[in-house]
Amino acid sequence: MSEDYLKMFTGVVLLIFVIIAGYFFSERNDRKMFLLSSLVFLVVNIACLYVLTASLWFLCGAIMSQGAALVVSIVAAALPDVTSFDRFRRIFICIMLSSVWSGVMWFFIRGLMTG
């Protein structure tokens, strides 16, 4: 197994560990939103780790970015649910906020790494 694949595997395991830990620290009502937000963050983080070089700084950035999924789920779950469309709106906001936040985080990390 090459060193890059080992770093990639380590990063994915750490990201999944952050998801499991966050699931138990999230409130009972926010767990579905947390899992949705974590899934979006996980997909973006794995894609960024695969495309970019899997160095220690990028692994730290991915873990930091994955930790933000808890904040996104709290924000999305705090929106009121009055009609059936509001539930779809909360899911849409959760997906979009997770994607944008993760993208901005990776842009910032990439900018720090390239100088």
Curated annotation (Swiss-Prot):
InterPro entries: Conjugal_tfr_repressor_TrbA (IPR016385). One of its GO terms (cellular component) is plasma membrane. The gene is trbA. It is a multi-pass membrane protein. Its main location: membrane. This is Protein TrbA. NCBIfam families: PRK13712.1 (NF010266). It is found in: Cell membrane. The chain crosses the membrane at residues 5-25, 39-59, 60-80, 91-111. Keywords: Cell membrane, Conjugation, Membrane, Plasmid, Transmembrane, Transmembrane helix. It comes from the Bacteria. It comes from Escherichia coli (strain K12).
